[in-house]
Amino acid sequence: MSGKRNSQEAALAITVFIRYQLDPFKRAMFETYARRWLAIIPKCGGECVGYWMPHEGTNNIAFALLSFPGLAEYESYRARLRADDEGMANFNFAEEHKFILAEERTFLRKVAA
C-alpha cells in the first residue's frame, strides 16, 4: 500500500517551469537575480531545482524549475515570499533594472509509473 500512496503523492507534487525572456544585454543582472533566488526560495519553502542561463544559441531565454508538494504549498510559499525582505528586494531589483522582458509560468506534474 505504501508504494501506491507514494506514487499518488508524487503525482500530486507540482513543478513550476518558468521561462524568462531577457534583455540580452543585461544577462549578468539576471544571473545575479537567479543566484539570489537559490537561497531565498528554499528559505520560503520551495525546492529550487535550478536556474538555467543561455550558453550557446538563443541569447535571451532563461529557465527555472521550482518544486512543491502541491498547489496549497505553492500558495503558502508565495505568501511567505511576499513577506520576505530579501525576496522583495530581489523582485524590486528586477523591476528597477528591467532585465526580464517577459515571464511565463507553467505548472507541471510528474508522470507516475
Regions of interest found by a model, annotated:
Residues 57-60:
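Short acidic/glycine-enriched loop/turn segments that link adjacent beta-strands
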